[in-house]
Regions:
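Conserved acyl-donor/pantetheine-binding loop and adjacent beta-alpha core of acyl/acetyltransferases
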Residues: 65, 78-119, 160-174
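Short acidic/glycine-enriched loop/turn segments that link adjacent beta-strands
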Residues: 195-200
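Active-site rim helix/loop that mediates acceptor-substrate recognition in acyltransferases
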Residues: 42-70, 75
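Conserved N-terminal entry element of GNAT/NAT acetyltransferase domains
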Residues: 1-47
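Conserved hydrophobic beta-strand within the GNAT/NAT acetyltransferase core sheet
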Residues: 116, 150-152
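Conserved acetyl-CoA-binding loop-helix of GNAT-fold acetyltransferases
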Residues: 116-121, 127-143
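Conserved beta-hairpin
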Residues: 26, 68-83
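Conserved active-site alpha-helix within GNAT-family acetyltransferase domains
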Residues: 143-148, 156-191
Length: 208
């Protein structure tokens, strides 16, 4: 199911689509182009034990069937970004995490929550609102596949030195920011003991 299209101030049309049947586009955004070269392939949370040759094969299989491993953003038809969104139970690292807790309260067990764990935007498409569109599309994708709650574990937007909203670098911000998730209607459920780029990460939730 496609998310509604959006037109940013620059005039381009953004569309967010499931990654099912679009492995080649996923590979352009989140993979590596040299066979066997080191790269995450968005496997860090899923199963980091797989080697460099196994990772693209795993994700190709995930992209071959519903619900798929996430969503892709397209700007005027060109693949531009990626968000990993899947049930928490599919992320081995999260199921064994000592720093990101399970929440037992609420109408849905933590293991049944869908989780948006990673965002990637191609350099030429940054600063165009793509992460907002990706998160909105990820939530819609999760809802379409029966999710009742979506979680994320973004970093604190505020500067850790107490100087307001500081600039977040691309590497630290791959998990998103609290400001991004708050704009999408998520609320802070718990502070975690996980950090990225020296900033604390929050467990944020949205009922869908």
């Amino acid at each position: 199911m496609a998310s509604p299209t959006a037109t940013p101030p620059t005039g381009e049309t953004i569309e967010v689509l499931p990654a099912v049947g679009r492995f080649d586009d996923f590979a352009l955004v989140a993979g590596v182009q040299k066979p066997g070269a080191g790269g995450c392939w968005c496997m860090s949370y899923r199963d980091s034990r797989l080697n460099n040759l196994e990772r693209p094969l795993y994700m190709a299989d995930e992209c071959s069937r519903d619900p798929g491993p996430g969503v892709l953003a397209y700007v005027d038809g060109e693949v531009a970004g990626w968000c990993s969104i899947a049930p928490r139970s599919s992320y081995r690292r999260l199921m064994n995490s000592r720093t990101i807790p399970f929440l037992d309260e609420g109408p849905v067990a933590a293991a049944d929550a869908w989780v948006a764990v990673c965002f990637v935007v191609q350099p030429k498409f940054r600063h165009q609102g793509l992460m907002n569109a990706l998160l909105e599309g990820a939530v819609e994708h999760a809802r379409a596949h029966g999710a009742r709650v979506v979680e994320g574990y973004p970093i604190e937007s505020a500067d850790p030195r107490g100087q307001g909203a500081g600039k977040v670098d691309v590497i630290s911000g791959y998990v998103g920011t609290t400001r991004l998730f708050e704009r999408a209607g998520f609320t802070r459920a718990a502070e975690t003991t996980a950090h990225s780029g020296g900033r604390v990460r929050w467990l944020m939730r949205k009922l869908v």
